[in-house]
């Protein structure tokens, strides 16, 4: 069978598609898989690295105000529809799967008009506009959170599957993770992750936190590449002594080690990050990004908070003092920390890729 994936822009739209594609190949060795994305998205790096073919089309998001840019966007949308149509005619997929991003619009719309079976996957608790529109035309809507169902009009099409994750994340033990990262096994490890682009408020708050931290506490700050030098400069300016219990790095390619080793993780609330930390049962303090569409990260974070798997601190309320108090409370009350871990695993859906694969087969 031939499978076409449309998704791109950010890792949050691409990683689920890759996970589903790998699940397909696990079950069908001879399956043909093609990815369609944009020319500037992260898919240009991630998809070929995983060994999949990628084709790109012209597309960009619509501005809400009428302007010259809006007219340009409409023109690009028409071009994108034509390019999507050409790819569909050439590849002749048996099914088309959309995992988010502007590229899904023209590809899924053309596929639906041609009568090709279609499925979309929504990663966030609050669905994006593109997926809400496409839900009227596709055969199945897979969602990651039970809370998402109410936002779709055609609820009979909606199936809760969870977010597909990379299976390698589950294979590393805590001892292996600590060893691989170069930390001691007899001291708690606090990890902060700002995401690939970094989060200045989280990073700078963590630098302030270092002034208060206990000597028996280990800290890993993953700054994001574009924030790394700023953070080092702030550490220098604040004259903070960094010993072997503290590591500050720009990026980590082996997040399976990080999730396995962390006692508490401080991070944003992107859907894929949350799927990964719940799968590993990591207690978390979530700082939702206020800079995303529809405030969807706070919606995601509140799901974990409601389940007792996380504490949520809004960025505007984040201080080193508040962070220190939360962390100290959790470390001083191991039964609470253990309960958070258990609650995280209870809401995880590690079989999401398998569920989505079965859904795909049910419509083809």
UniProtKB/Swiss-Prot annotation:
Alphabetized GO MF terms: UDP-N-acetyl-D-glucosamine:N-acetylmuramoyl-L-alanyl-D-glutamyl-meso-2,6-diaminopimelyl-D-alanyl-D-alanine-diphosphoundecaprenol 4-beta-N-acetylglucosaminlytransferase activity; undecaprenyldiphospho-muramoylpentapeptide beta-N-acetylglucosaminyltransferase activity
UniProt GO cellular component terms: plasma membrane
Binding site for UDP-N-acetyl-alpha-D-glucosamine: 10-12, 124, 166, 196, 297
Catalytic activity field: di-trans,octa-cis-undecaprenyl diphospho-N-acetyl-alpha-D-muramoyl-L-alanyl-D-glutamyl-meso-2,6-diaminopimeloyl-D-alanyl-D-alanine + UDP-N-acetyl-alpha-D-glucosamine = di-trans,octa-cis-undecaprenyl diphospho-[N-acetyl-alpha-D-glucosaminyl-(1->4)]-N-acetyl-alpha-D-muramoyl-L-alanyl-D-glutamyl-meso-2,6-diaminopimeloyl-D-alanyl-D-alanine + UDP + H(+)
E.C. number(s) listed in UniProt: 2.4.1.227
GO terms of biological process kind: carbohydrate metabolic process; cell division; cell wall organization; lipid glycosylation; peptidoglycan biosynthetic process; regulation of cell shape
Keywords of this entry: Cell cycle, Cell division, Cell membrane, Cell shape, Cell wall biogenesis/degradation, Glycosyltransferase, Membrane, Peptidoglycan synthesis, Transferase
Annotated localization: Cell membrane
Pathway named in the protein's UniProt entry: Cell wall biogenesis; peptidoglycan biosynthesis
Topological category with respect to the lipid bilayer: Peripheral membrane protein
HAMAP family xref list: MurG
Main function: Cell wall formation. Catalyzes the transfer of a GlcNAc subunit on undecaprenyl-pyrophosphoryl-MurNAc-pentapeptide (lipid intermediate I) to form undecaprenyl-pyrophosphoryl-MurNAc-(pentapeptide)GlcNAc (lipid intermediate II).
Family: Belongs to the glycosyltransferase 28 family. MurG subfamily.
Identification of the protein by name: UDP-N-acetylglucosamine--N-acetylmuramyl-(pentapeptide) pyrophosphoryl-undecaprenol N-acetylglucosamine transferase
Organism: Thermoanaerobacter pseudethanolicus (strain ATCC 33223 / 39E)
């Amino acid at each position: 069978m031939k499978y076409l994936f449309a998704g791109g822009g950010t890792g949050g739209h691409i990683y689920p598609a890759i996970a589903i594609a790998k699940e397909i190949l696990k079950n069908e060795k001879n399956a043909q898989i093609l990815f369609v994305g944009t020319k500037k998205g992260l898919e240009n790096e991630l998809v070929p690295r995983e060994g999949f073919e990628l084709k790109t089309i012209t597309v960009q998001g619509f501005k809400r105000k009428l302007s010259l840019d809006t007219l340009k966007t409409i023109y690009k949308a028409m071009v994108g529809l034509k390019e999507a149509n050409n790819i569909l005619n050439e590849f002749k997929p048996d099914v088309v799967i959309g995992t988010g991003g502007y590229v899904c619009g023209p590809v899924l719309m053309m596929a639906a008009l041609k009568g090709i079976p279609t499925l979309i996957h929504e990663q966030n608790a609050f669905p994006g506009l593109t997926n809400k529109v496409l839900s009227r035309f596709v055969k199945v809507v897979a969602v990651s959170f039970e809370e998402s169902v109410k936002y779709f009009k055609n609820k009979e099409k909606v199936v809760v599957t969870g977010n597909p994750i990379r299976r390698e994340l589950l294979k590393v033990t805590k001892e292996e993770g600590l060893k691989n990262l170069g930390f001691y096994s007899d001291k708690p490890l606090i990890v902060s992750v700002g995401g690939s682009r970094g989060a200045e408020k989280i990073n700078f708050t963590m630098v302030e936190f270092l002034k208060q931290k206990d000597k028996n506490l280990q800290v890993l700050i993953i700054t994001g590449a574009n924030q790394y030098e700023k953070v080092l400069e702030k550490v220098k300016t604040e004259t903070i002594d960094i010993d072997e219990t503290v590591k500050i790095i720009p990026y980590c390619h082996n997040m399976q080690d990080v999730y396995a080793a962390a006692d508490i993780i401080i991070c944003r609330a992107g859907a894929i990050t949350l799927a990964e930390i719940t799968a590993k049962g990591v207690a978390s303090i979530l700082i939702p990004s206020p800079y995303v569409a529809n405030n969807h990260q706070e919606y995601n974070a509140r799901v974990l908070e409601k389940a007792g798997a996380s504490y949520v601190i809004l960025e505007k309320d984040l201080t080193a003092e508040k962070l220190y108090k939360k962390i100290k409370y959790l470390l001083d009350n191991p039964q609470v920390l253990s309960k958070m871990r258990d609650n995280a695993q209870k809401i995880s859906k590690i079989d999401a890729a398998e569920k989505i694969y079965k859904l795909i087969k049910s419509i083809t």
